[in-house]
């Protein structure tokens, strides 16, 4: 299950080989569409990468730090450094292909 993260220890949670941070908000319709997709992807790739959910409501400092201007946005971290950002809703198969490539890097 993805870790629901707060700003308190965000930097600690994004360390490691590959961490996928799902920036979302409870009022966001597209975020709700992504929830089941992200759950399936975490089941598939959770043994090879970490999945973190970050609610941007009340935590705008972290979102701004990584230039997250809209949700849903996925930011991929390697060893604590933000490497890529994907914004919007994508089909499960497209994200699965993307994660396969990123895990292999």
Residue spans for each PLM region:
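N-terminal "domain-start" segment that seeds a small globular fold
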Residues: 1-13
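Thiol-based oxidoreductase modules, predominantly thioredoxin-like and allied folds used
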Residues: 5, 23, 35-42, 46-61
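Conserved hydrophobic/aromatic "anchor" residues
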Residues: 10, 23-24, 66, 77
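CheY-like receiver
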Residues: 12-13, 62, 98
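Short active-site neighborhood of thiol/selenol oxidoreductases, capturing the structured segment around
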Residues: 14-24
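Structural micro-motif
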Residues: 19, 60, 66-75
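Short cysteine clusters
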Residues: 28-31
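Non-catalytic, surface beta->alpha helical segment in thiol-disulfide oxidoreductase systems
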Residues: 78-105
